[in-house]
C-alpha cells in the first residue's frame, strides 16, 4: 500500500492522518523531497544551506521606512508637475514646471526662448542643447551656422496659405494641412514646446491652420495660430490655439478667439472650443463669452431666448447658459416654476465697456476675405442644388433612353 489512512479521536474531534509509504515507487517526488530536507545541501546539492538561505531578503523596519520616504518624495514631485495648468488658451505668461528635455534654449529670430515642455523632434535635434528655427518657414536646425546658411536661401516671407484677413500690419493666413503638411507639422512641433496637452504633431491633413502674423516691413512674423477640423462632428471651431510666449500679454489670444467665432458666424453655425479647456483657457474663454453675451443682450430687440442669444453670438447653447449664470441674470422663479432672465442694463454695459478697455485689439469683420471650406461631398451637393449636375439615377435613365433611341 502506498498510503495508509488512520483515524484518531480526541476530545470529540476526529483527526484524519494520511501516512505515505516513502519506499513506494508510485511517489518518487515525495521521497526526493524528504532526501532534500534531510541532506546538508539544497537544490539537489547545487547550493549549500548558506547560499540558499533567504532570511536576509525579508523586509525589516528600515526597509519599510525607506520605501515610504521614497514614495512620499515621488508623489510630491508628481503633484507639483500636474499642478501647473496648460497655457494653451491664455494670453498671460505663466512659468511652467521644469521638464526632462535636452533642449535648453530655442532660438527663434532674435529671441532666445526657454522651452516649457518636450516636443517630439527627431532624435538628432531633440538631443541638442539648442534648437534653431527659421521664422519664415519654421524649419528646425541644430546649429546657428546651418541656420545662417538656410536664411541665405530661404525665400519665404509669409505662411504658405491664403491671406484671408489684413488690418494694417496684422494678417491671418489660412493654411491647409493637406497641401502644406511640412509647414503645419513644423508649426505643431513648435507649439508642443509650449503646450502640455497637445497630442497632434504629424497627422495634419484633416485640419486647417489659421496663422496670425505681424508685418515688420520685410516679412510676416508668426505670432500665434489656431487650428480647426475641416469636418467636425462636434461643432468645434477650435482644436488647438497658441500665442507664442514672446507675443503674450498683448491681447493676441483673445483676438484669435474672436476671429474663430467670426469664421463660425460666416459659416452660419454654432461653435465651441474643443474640451476640456485648461484653467487659464477657461478663464479667457469665459471672459470673452461674458462680453459677447452682454453685447447680445444689449442689442437684441426681439423676444430674448437662449436660441436667439446663441444665434447672435455663434455660441452653442451650453456655453450661453453657463455665461448667463456667471452674469447672474439666469435665475429660477419659484412662483412661475421656470427659469427667467433678470437683466440689469447698467451692469451689462459695465461688463462690455470694461472688456473693450482691456482688449482694444478687435477683429473687423469687414476686412475678412474668406469662404467656408467645402469638401468633395459638399461641392457635389451644392452643384446638385444649383441644377448644374444631374443626379446619378436620372443620368442612367437618360443614358438608357438615348441608347434605345439609337437602336
UniProtKB/Swiss-Prot annotation:
The gene is mst2. InterPro entries: Acyl_CoA_acyltransferase, HAT_MYST-type, MYST_HAT, WH-like_DNA-bd_sf, Zf-MYST. It catalyses: L-lysyl-[protein] + acetyl-CoA = N(6)-acetyl-L-lysyl-[protein] + CoA + H(+). PROSITE patterns: MYST_HAT. Acetyl-CoA binds at residues 241-243, 248-254, 278, 287. GO terms for molecular function: chromatin binding; histone acetyltransferase activity; histone H3K14 acetyltransferase activity; transcription coregulator activity; zinc ion binding. This is Histone acetyltransferase mst2. It comes from Schizosaccharomyces pombe (strain 972 / ATCC 24843). GO terms for biological process: DNA damage response; heterochromatin boundary formation; heterochromatin formation; regulation of transcription by RNA polymerase II. Autoacetylation at Lys-198 is required for proper function. It comes from the Eukaryota. Its EC number is 2.3.1.48. It is found in: Cytoplasm; Nucleus.
